[in-house]
């Protein structure tokens, strides 16, 4: 791919340098770090803002709906934007500034105001935060067409994106969360009685959340406000660095000559409605991606992971170990799949292979959970990335169990198949943008990106509510379960429903949606030839 010319004017193909795609993909990781930060916000709302568990989950859903509502408006602005700084890069800058400012206010300011003001201020801060999130997120989709329109190069974005997300989501974050962050900020009355008393005095709702074990009161780190202030500064700083890399990656290609037909276009609301009604590609992609995202958000929810490893398997630290052990194999299989399937057979085929593979792995993993639940027979070595001496635990076979080994093997393929189905949808939005140029002559990347995000956020916003409601049904109505919660049959089946049941529904939606998705590899080659012709005619007309 690196030996191909950056432009093939006869075929209307323009390509990006490989490093440009890699840097551009950092923008998606930048916003995903904020998603990780806010992924456990229900704990903060319960402990610090003072809401009940179900209400905290519902607030997350309501605010995600607001998140979706802002998308079409931002998309319209993107499609009308053409500055000296480009069409897309200004939105990274604006979004990043708002994200840091509002998240700082949420986690550093709120704990220091009166209880009566916390919830109203949280709503204000979060509404503004969402606008920033939308501004930066839209660029991940809207800039895809101007970066490259080569169908064989677009999956490279998914390859970089998968590497970044696997390393962060599967490797660094679980180990950091379960092995460092939560243990560091978990307090017990034997050692931190005065600190717990001070936090309860400042945040009265924490009194109902303290767990007693062997006569010692424990405040889980998820409910410690100091954890959130540190977490925000860490994620905000990393996100800023990644956003800068994303801007650099777009620098050469974020210009008018790479926008659609290469000239100015007036986009109206009527055009948007026509796209919604007739672009079958984006319709089916939205159905597939949104159902998948709902399931993924529910499965990866902090409460679900804490219960699965801390309560059902019996050792929360094993979450980080499993993630660390599986990361490299998952990464290698994912990259191989994107290279051999997405680039050679098409992105649609890649999504379907990932879907069927995920479903098969999930069925087998359910049996492992049922066989291991609360029996003390699930074991994998625990180790710390900061303590080299603990790496030897991996070769201590006494720390491995059969169920632990089976889980590791299945988790590798489960993760790889999940990445194939989930990460390929972003470059697929670029195909839908080109399909719209082919279908109607309109170049509306902002609409494609924000329409995708709108429905995606609207549906996936149900995840916190579903997690809260399902756990409330088995006895956790006042607070979400943590790794310190007691085991019960109810908590077992609630976790299975969230970790496996909801994803299964999403995978079935994938299969149905892809039956009607028109953009195969062969179709995209035809589309690029027609788009090149449309662009050439438009440029000749502009010169005349």
Which residues are covered by each model-predicted region?
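Membrane-embedded alpha-helical bundles of multi-pass transporters/translocases
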Residues: 2-544
């Amino acid at each position: 791919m690196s030996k191909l010319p950056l432009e093939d004017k006869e075929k209307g193909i323009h390509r990006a340098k490989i490093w440009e795609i890699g840097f551009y993909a950092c923008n998606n990781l930048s916003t995903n770090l904020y998603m990780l930060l806010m992924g456990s916000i229900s704990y903060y709302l319960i402990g610090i803002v003072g809401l009940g568990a179900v209400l905290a989950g519902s607030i997350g859903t309501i605010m995600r709906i607001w998140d979706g509502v802002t998308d079409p408006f931002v998309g319209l602005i993107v499609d009308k934007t053409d500055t000296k700084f480009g069409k897309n890069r200004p939105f990274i800058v604006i979004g990043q500034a708002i994200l840091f400012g509002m998240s700082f206010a949420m986690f550093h300011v709120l704990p220091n105001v009166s209880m009566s003001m916390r919830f109203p201020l949280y709503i204000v801060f979060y509404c503004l935060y969402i606008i920033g999130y939308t501004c930066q997120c839209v660029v991940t989709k809207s800039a895809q067409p101007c970066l490259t329109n080569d169908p064989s190069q677009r999956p490279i974005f998914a390859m970089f994106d998968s590497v970044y997300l696997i390393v962060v989501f599967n490797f660094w974050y679980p180990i950091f969360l379960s092995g460092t962050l939560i243990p560091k900020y978990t307090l017990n009355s034997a050692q931190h009685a005065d600190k717990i008393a001070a936090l309860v005095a400042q945040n009265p709702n924490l009194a109902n959340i303290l767990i007693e074990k062997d006569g010692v009161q424990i405040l889980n780190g998820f409910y410690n406000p100091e954890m959130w202030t540190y977490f925000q500064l860490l994620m905000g700083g990393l996100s800023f660095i990644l956003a800068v890399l994303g801007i650099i990656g777009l620098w050469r290609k974020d210009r008018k000559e790479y926008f659609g037909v290469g000239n100015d276009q007036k986009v109206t609301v009527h055009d948007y409605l026509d796209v919604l009604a007739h672009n079958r590609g984006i319709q089916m992609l939205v159905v597939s991606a949104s159902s998948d995202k709902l399931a993924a958000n529910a499965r990866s929810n902090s409460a679900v992971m804490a219960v699965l490893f801390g309560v059902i398997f019996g050792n929360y630290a094993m979450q980080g170990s499993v993630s660390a052990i599986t990361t490299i194999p998952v990464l290698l299989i994912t990259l191989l799949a994107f290279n051999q399937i997405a680039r050679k057979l098409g992105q649609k085929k890649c999504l379907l292979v990932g879907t069927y593979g995920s479903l098969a792995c999930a069925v087998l993993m359910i049996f492992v959970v049922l066989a291991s639940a609360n029996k003390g027979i699930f074991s994998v070595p625990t180790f710390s990335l900061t303590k080299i001496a603990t790496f030897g635990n991996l070769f201590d076979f006494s720390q491995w169990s059969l169920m632990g080994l089976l889980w590791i093997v299945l988790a590798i393929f489960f993760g790889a198949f999940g990445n194939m189905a989930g990460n390929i949808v972003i470059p697929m939005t670029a195909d839908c943008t080109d399909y719209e140029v082919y279908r109607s002559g309109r170049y509306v990347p902002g609409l494609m990106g924000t329409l995708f995000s709108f429905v995606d956020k609207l549906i996936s916003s149900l995840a916190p509510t579903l997690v809260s409601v399902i756990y409330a049904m088995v006895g956790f109505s006042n607070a979400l379960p943590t790794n310190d919660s007691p085991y019960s049959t109810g908590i077992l089946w609630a976790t299975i429903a969230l970790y496996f049941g909801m994803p299964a529904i999403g995978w079935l939606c994938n299969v149905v949606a892809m039956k009607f998705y028109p953009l195969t590899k062969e179709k995209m080659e035809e589309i690029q030839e027609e788009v090149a012709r449309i662009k050439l005619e438009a440029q000749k007309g502009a010169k005349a």
